[in-house]
């Protein structure tokens, strides 16, 4: 069994393509179960383990499965997003084994985020694991991968200053607004949604004391709770088109599968505003604001991808923290690869133990019969020990005897390492073929 990660993120795919592969929490369990059903049909081997991490910046499918399932997994994901497999391949990354583990560790630690070191991704990954566990698709191999990811992320955040020298998406939005408006204390800000990202954006804007703030959310009660924290007004999402003109800045981030703010609504708002500019930030994937809105002369619309240049600033201290974090991650990768390799030998170890137990049981049955016939204990013990020795060595000696000269030296080295701890007797391996007196003593 192998571990692989298939995904696309803000560095490999545009926001519109990422939106095709965005999943809500409610969609994860049925999607994972559908994936497992699809890949366990026909002649495909094994039952794959799977988990999906879906955020505004990435969608990633983590699997523990046989290597030949990689291509079917890609085709399945492409079908879910309604694109061709070749199109997805062009924008996706496929990582296997140690590379997949390294990627998971970097994601959990915030090194692969648009905002370096951002803490939200760790919580999102933990939620993805809980959803996979509830769906029954997690499995012991992925469980180990993610638990090690969380441990590495904790060490990175404890031992380095990762994230200290970066700014958040919300802070970047405030910076952009400050470039457009002379005084943020005079603007009116509308937040659409009531999730973690909107809460963070409201915190940053509130620190600049805008003239007025409002929260529009589909669930009015949740919107009211957030609004009360910042002394803001709570409005119904259904009232948004009629009230859009009241606001100079709009920040939106919801889980809607369709845009909430359309071109027509913005055009009407601009007309009422006599074309005073509107600053808009769409942090949602899929988009909350129709992309055509960006064509309007008096609208300054920014998406998560547009904010990337701002949040990538950092300096030398940030580079030093990254180097420290990468070293911690590399140690974790080597440990996981070693564990995964050991896990691959488990079936062999189980088979060896079963074979040894079978030999032991057979010899015990034989010994008991000899004792019942009145044989001496010493004779029975001698026969039992010889029987076990012959069974243990027969297969190995037979392979040595049957091997050709080219194979014999390598096989002899392996046998020596396993049975003699590397001490090969002189003349144990000869370059020539078998001599006439070669035989299997005692077999």
UniProtKB/Swiss-Prot annotation:
Pfam families to which the protein is assigned, alphabetical: GlutR_dimer, GlutR_N, Shikimate_DH
Q: How does it assemble?
A: Homodimer.
Q: What does this protein do?
A: Catalyzes the NADPH-dependent reduction of glutamyl-tRNA(Glu) to glutamate 1-semialdehyde (GSA).
Q: Which InterPro entries does the record match to this protein? A: 4pyrrol_synth_GluRdtase (IPR000343), 4pyrrol_synth_GluRdtase_dimer (IPR015896), 4pyrrol_synth_GluRdtase_N (IPR015895), GluRdtase_CS (IPR018214), GluRdtase_dimer_dom_sf (IPR036453), GluRdtase_N_sf (IPR036343), NAD(P)-bd_dom_sf (IPR036291), Shikm_DH/Glu-tRNA_Rdtase (IPR006151)
Positions that bind NADP(+): 193-198
User: What does UniProt list as catalytic?
Assistant: 56 (nucleophile)
Organism in which the protein naturally occurs? Methylibium petroleiphilum (strain ATCC BAA-1232 / LMG 22953 / PM1)
UniProt family annotation? Belongs to the glutamyl-tRNA reductase family.
Write out the catalysed reaction.
(S)-4-amino-5-oxopentanoate + tRNA(Glu) + NADP(+) = L-glutamyl-tRNA(Glu) + NADPH + H(+)
Misc remark for this entry? During catalysis, the active site Cys acts as a nucleophile attacking the alpha-carbonyl group of tRNA-bound glutamate with the formation of a thioester intermediate between enzyme and glutamate, and the concomitant release of tRNA(Glu). The thioester intermediate is finally reduced by direct hydride transfer from NADPH, to form the product GSA.
Q: Where does substrate bind?
A: 55-58, 113, 118-120, 124
What are the site positions for Important for activity? 103
SUPFAM superfamilies per the record?
Answer: Glutamyl tRNA-reductase catalytic, N-terminal domain, Glutamyl tRNA-reductase dimerization domain, NAD(P)-binding Rossmann-fold domains
Gene3D superfamilies according to UniProt: Glutamyl-tRNA reductase, N-terminal domain (3.30.460.30), NAD(P)-binding Rossmann-like Domain (3.40.50.720)
Q: What is this protein called?
A: Glutamyl-tRNA reductase
């Amino acid at each position: 069994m192998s571990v692989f990660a298939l995904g696309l993120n803000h560095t490999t795919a545009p926001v519109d393509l990422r939106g095709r592969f965005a999943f809500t929490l409610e969609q994860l369990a049925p999607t994972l179960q559908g994936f497992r059903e699809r890949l366990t049909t026909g002649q495909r081997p094994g039952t794959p383990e799977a988990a999906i991490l879906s955020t505004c910046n990435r969608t990633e499918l983590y699997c523990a499965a046989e290597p030949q399932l990689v291509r079917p997994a890609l085709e399945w994901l492409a079908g879910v997003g309604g694109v061709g497999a070749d199109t997805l391949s062009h924008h996706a990354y496929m990582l296997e084994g140690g590379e997949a583990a390294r990627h998971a560790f970097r994601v959990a630690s915030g090194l692969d985020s648009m905002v370096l070191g951002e803490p939200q991704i760790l919580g999102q990954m933990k939620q993805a694991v809980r959803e996979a566990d509830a769906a029954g698709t997690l499995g012991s191999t992925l469980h180990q991968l993610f638990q090690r990811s969380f441990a590495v992320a904790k060490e990175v955040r404890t031992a380095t200053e990762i994230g200290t020298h970066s700014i958040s998406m919300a802070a970047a939005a405030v910076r952009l607004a400050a470039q457009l408006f002379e005084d943020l204390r005079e603007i009116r800000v509308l937040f659409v949604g009531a999730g973690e990202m909107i809460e963070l954006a409201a915190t940053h804007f509130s620190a600049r004391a805008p003239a007025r703030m409002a929260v529009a959310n589909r669930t009015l009660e949740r919107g009211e709770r957030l609004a009360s924290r910042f002394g803001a007004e709570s409005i119904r999402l259904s009232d948004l088109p009629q009230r859009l003109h009241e606001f100079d800045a709009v920040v939106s981030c919801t889980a809607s599968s369709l845009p909430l703010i359309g071109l027509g609504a913005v055009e009407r708002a601009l007309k009422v505003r006599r074309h005073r500019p509107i600053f808009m930030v769409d942090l949602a994937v899929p988009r909350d604001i129709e992309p055509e809105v960006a064509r309007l002369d008096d609208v300054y619309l920014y998406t998560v991808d547009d904010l990337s240049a701002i949040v990538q600033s950092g300096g030398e201290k940030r580079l030093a923290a990254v180097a420290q974090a990468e070293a911690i991650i590399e140690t974790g990768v080597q440990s996981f690869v070693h564990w995964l390799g050991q896990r691959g030998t488990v079936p062999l170890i189980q088979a060896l133990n079963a074979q040894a137990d079978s030999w032991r049981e057979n010899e015990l049955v034989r010994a008991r019969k000899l004792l019942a016939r009145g044989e001496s204990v010493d004779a029975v013990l001698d026969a039992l020990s010889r029987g076990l020795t012959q069974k243990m060595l027969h297969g190995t000696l037979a392979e040595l005897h049957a091997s050709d000269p080219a194979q014999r030296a390598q096989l002899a080295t392996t046998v020596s390492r396993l049975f003699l701890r590397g001490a090969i007797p002189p003349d144990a391996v000869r370059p020539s073929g078998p001599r006439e007196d070669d035989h299997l003593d005692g077999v």
